[in-house]
Amino acid sequence: IVVFDARRIVESLRLETGLRPELAQRIAQDIEAIVRQSALRRVTSSLLRTLIDAKLIEYGLDAEYRAHSRLGLPITDIDRIIKQANQRTTPLPLTPEGTGLEIAAAIKREYALLAVFSAPVAEAHLVGDIFIQDLGAIDRPYAIVQSPDVVKRYGFTLPNRFAASRPARHPEVLVAHLVKSSAALQGYVNGAVEWDAVNFSLAPYLDGLGERELLQVAEALMFELSATAVGRGGNLPTCVIHLDWQVPPYLAERPAIGPGGNFTGRTYQDYRSVARRFLWALFAAYRDGDGQKLPFSGIRLVLHATPQDADPEWQTLVVKACRASLERGNVWFAFDHTPDRAFLSRFGLPYAASFAEAATDEWCAAAFQAVAINLPRAAHRAAPGKVVEVFEELTRLMDIAAQSHLEKRVFLEKLLARGEDGPLALLAARRGGRPFLKLSRTTHRVCPVGLNDLTQAVTGHQLHESSVARDFGARVIAHLAAEATRLSSRHKTHFVLAESHAEGMTERFAHMDARFFPRTAADGYPLDDAYPVENYVNGAKLSPAADLSPWQRAQWEGEVQQGSLLNATTDVWLGDALPTPEQLATLVDKVRFNGLTTGLMASPEFTACSVCGHVAVGSARACAACGAPQVETLAMLTNRYSRVSGWSTAAQSERHRRVRVTGHSL
């Protein structure tokens, strides 16, 4: 509450907007007249700013209005967030720390659209041409991936020497360092923190340990990584652990870093036996789950498979991994069809160009941003039957997505330039005389959304309905990949196609297209009443309602995607009648050899009882242990498990349309 003084309005306008003194004085006089006429007993700064903003708009001063805007939320929205009146999808409720983060993210979203992105980019986001993911995290990169060797070599260090530890000498200390590093990095990125080749990287610390000790290390790693959500106020971070049966080709002959950050005199290839034993222990710990037998929150295991994996021990491991997937979910099988693909799929950059000359303790890459493009929008903007116009529109969408990336990159570069005194101090820190994150090792993800819906609009068929549709879909992906290469060369940065996992994005695109482009069959666009467009199909996937065998789905998605999308997986939705681990392992092995599919994830559902705490695989209306009807279904939404009761209507409808896989269908 302030005492009204017109001179302060003049000072504020000149300071915040650079307005000419005479114009600022005129606006101040207008505001003073309004206040005098209103007979208000109290005049707050918020009210004054609102009145000034209205006058700036009245005078046609749009740039000055944007500069003068106050960012914030209505009281009802803040009340809803604090009291959590809305249902949340995540398994954990928000703590006061979490609600503070939610409110801050909402304000940052406004700031991003007003102050970071240009008007054309902001408009493209608002009208649904593109979707800039994680606007509430505008001041941080999207995701980061690194080798554990970074922590092994230099220990755990916080910026400005706030806290530091020497390189670990024992496996349990190394686990603590990895967990603390993950927790620290999750404050600097909004997406996943990924660790590469974890079982091989930790192997030099585990040499000589028995099976019980290996299991204890594995259990500590799993539990501690899943507990980092406590520090985020209930917001579940994602930690991705990459695992290998064969030592990755790019790591095989590299000198191994062992206890104390010292080289052991051996290569990682020499630790294959202990790395495999630790891999067994990790899946055993993961299968046990947490203390309530629930899936570990926020952890995703990625088991990489290569064409060389053929020995009986590998087959036994796959069965074990499939059993963990059936009982706990969140296990992703990644298929490294070539040595180049093995590195690219993890770091998003080619090994030879970016990392071949660097030591393993320098291996760190980040995705600065992820921007989704609305593929069906290209069909809506083009004239019916004009395929050339569709591809021209796709090029335009790629250009505007690239522009949004460049604008955020400039913003982040300014923050990084402030070094260890800036907000991105941990990423700007120097390790061993070298920067922790090099700008040359950053990528920008462009995420196609709705290829199936675009294909249906252009060809009259969904991807699974005809080879003509799949050929068209493959042409679209090839065009987008070529555009990403062109834009990378033009702007001297790395644009990559990737699969998006943003919640609510596909529904938003579908609703905005229905609002702005209400097409009918008379306009030349085929409609299908059995396929309501309330939620586009994500990425370059086939419809979840397509009645196909999982092998056929994986084959056709691989043909369309052509290995061009990072993090692309074929979803296998499981019903209540689960297949056996052996049946699922047979599917994994069959898909592995098609040379096309990049990933496979089998996702069961879970029923958690709110009364007795019992957790069972499958979706049920009552608890199998105590019979109570107070149960909650946990299911996969995009790439994480969440409470179905908190899903949107469109997401729940999509879940009901999913074709479930049973042992008979395999």
Protein language model features and the residues they cover:
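Short, intrinsically disordered, low-complexity segments enriched in Ser/Thr and Pro
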Residues: 22, 481-488, 661-666
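Catalytic-loop motifs flanking and including active-site residues across diverse enzymes
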Residues: 5, 9, 194, 447-451, ...
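Charged, amphipathic alpha-helical regulatory modules used
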Residues: 1-85, 653-660
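Contiguous, well-ordered alpha-helical segments that form the cores/surfaces of helical PPI scaffolds
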Residues: 200, 444-457, 478
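Long, charge-rich boundary regions
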Residues: 625-666
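Conserved catalytic cores of very large enzyme subunits
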Residues: 82-440, 461-462, 466-624, 628-633
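Core of folded catalytic or high-affinity ligand/protein-binding domains
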Residues: 436, 440, 446-447, 453, ...
